[in-house]
Amino acid sequence: MKYILVTGGVISGIGKGIIASSIGTILKSCGLRVTAIKIDPYINIDAGTFSPYEHGEVFVLNDGGEVDLDLGNYERFLDINLYKDNNITTGKIYQHVINKERRGDYLGKTVQVVPHITDAVQEWVMNQAMVPVDGHKEEPQICVIELGGTIGDIEGMPFVEAFRQFQFKAKRENFCNIHVSLVPQPSATGEQKTKPTQNSVRALRGLGLSPDLIVCRSSTPIEMAVKEKISMFCHVNPEQVICIHDVSSTYRVPVLLEEQGIIKYFKERLDLPIGDSASSLLSKWRNMADRYERLQKTCSIALVGKYTKLRDCYASVFKALEHSALAINHKLNLMYIDSIDLEQTTEVEDPVKFHEAWQKLCKADGVLVPGGFGIRGTLGKLQAISWARSRKIPFLGVCLGMQLAVIEFARNCLNLKDADSTEFEPNARVPVVIDMPEHNPGNLGGTMRLGIRRTVFKTENSILRKLYGDVPFIEERHRHRYEVNPSLISQLEQKDLSFVGQDVDGERMEIIELANHPYFVGVQFHPEFSSRPMKPSPPYLGLLLAATGNLNAYLLQGCKLSSSDRYSDASDDSFSEPRLAELEIS
């Protein structure tokens, strides 16, 4: 087993996750089996109870693990399925050690950070690195480990010490440290500054780790003189200094790394059984990056949510939309709309903000209402849903978005004006959305319906079933506490709101579709968590196809993109327009 540790310096949020994912992608393209581990030094057990504004979105894994959004990057880049134990937190490690102490496993010894916490970290990493993640039973050959935060943070000290010890346990030919640092370029001088990187590497070396590669993040490509200066002061060769400047798309990052000789370096440094160049997999990434930069036609989607001030709150949603847009040769224009800005109270308090929000919504080719919690902003979401339904604008509701779509339909089409969710009104007169029986209201952590679940299609005449390849059932990831009230299903279906997907017991409603509408779909699950750059999520792909007017033609040709539409160089035209012109649009 080979271990690649990715650390960061100067500031957080400079792209360690993308760089770690890109390194894994390059090594996978060389034919190696790769897994990934993310270490978060916070004391929380997991990310499940985080505010989205605190740490971005909560990414859900197949096994129900609620983890850091960087694990989503690993899954998307590497096309693997990770487990909750691939996300290590300080809380998990301390809980593990304390439980062992309570059981008497330490035989009465004084339990300390060194050696007990550091040993627990090393043991966890070694055990989890051996778990297959790509659908095969063979163990991974490479484990990419990202240490969150920055070097010098007090929270991360036990982990740095653990890896200082671990590098000798694993031996030099099996352990490599990549340090990601910022090279700022003040606008006043325009000069690229190396001092922050020098200080960061000095701090890392002072803690017992020496970087094998220094990845410099910068706004523009770093100059050779700057590279040589970093090499001289940081005790590495110039070829060990890698530049990753700001690019238009993250698809370009693996290509930049490969162009700077990283494959040859890893082959020699870790004694890997690979050639000097990558396979066709990396060529596809290069094609995607080239194609993304040449896209000309645009599709505008309005994302109506309550956490729009921080884009990371909807990171997977954005990626799923981007994957789908790229698959049909369109550039995504995602317009974030705070749902509160659509409400009447905002019209009174801030008319300019109110009208700007509605102008965005009216310009959109499609509307998306993602998941969320709480009553704040729900009126604005309901108004956006009503707008999309009544004006036949393509719409996708995810989790809470589906629940609100059912509430809006009940109020305006069934005239059930008191229709509501017990999440917002516990004593609702018409409880359209209700609490699930297994939910324990005592604790918030780990009390939801989480992880991958099977959804069975109840009819063959379903748009979403066709988009999924006309399969009888699908498996997608869930994260919710509430569900549509089964006692109201017959009333809703009489008005053409069909519940085309249910759970295996037929008790929980999973998918809705509205008849006589271009695309009005709601899903209780979160399909964005399973979207991949080369395998877009079907519900999101359907939204983009409908928003560009190509859904019917796509369904007529058997839900297949032509060869010129999937990650090729032919990006001047939109989705298969010559072929679409020959098809009769129903």
UniProtKB/Swiss-Prot annotation:
UniProt KW keywords: ATP-binding, Glutamine amidotransferase, Ligase, Nucleotide-binding, Phosphoprotein, Pyrimidine biosynthesis
GO CC aspect terms: cytoophidium; cytoplasm
UniProt pathway annotation: Pyrimidine metabolism; CTP biosynthesis via de novo pathway; CTP from UDP: step 2/2
GO biological process, one term: CTP biosynthetic process
Signal peptide interval: none
Residue numbers carrying Phosphoserine: 568, 571, 574
GO-annotated molecular function: ATP binding; CTP synthase activity; identical protein binding
Domain Glutamine amidotransferase type-1: residue ranges: 300-554
Pfam families for this protein: CTP_synth_N (PF06418), GATase (PF00117)
TM ranges: none
InterPro entries, sorted: Class_I_gatase-like (IPR029062), CTP_synthase (IPR004468), CTP_synthase_N (IPR017456), GATASE (IPR017926), GATase1_CTP_Synthase (IPR033828), P-loop_NTPase (IPR027417)
Root EC class: ligase
Disordered: region residues: 564-586
Enzymatic reactions: UTP + L-glutamine + ATP + H2O = CTP + L-glutamate + ADP + phosphate + 2 H(+)
Purpose: Catalyzes the ATP-dependent amination of UTP to CTP with either L-glutamine or ammonia as the source of nitrogen. Constitutes the rate-limiting enzyme in the synthesis of cytosine nucleotides.
NCBIfam families registered for this protein in UniProt: PRK05380.1, PyrG
PANTHER family named among the record's database cross-references: CTP SYNTHASE (PTHR11550), CTP SYNTHASE 2 (PTHR11550:SF2)
Family: Belongs to the CTP synthase family.
Record's protein name: CTP synthase 2
Organism this protein belongs to: Bos taurus (Bovine)
Lineage: Eukaryota, Metazoa, Chordata, Craniata, Vertebrata
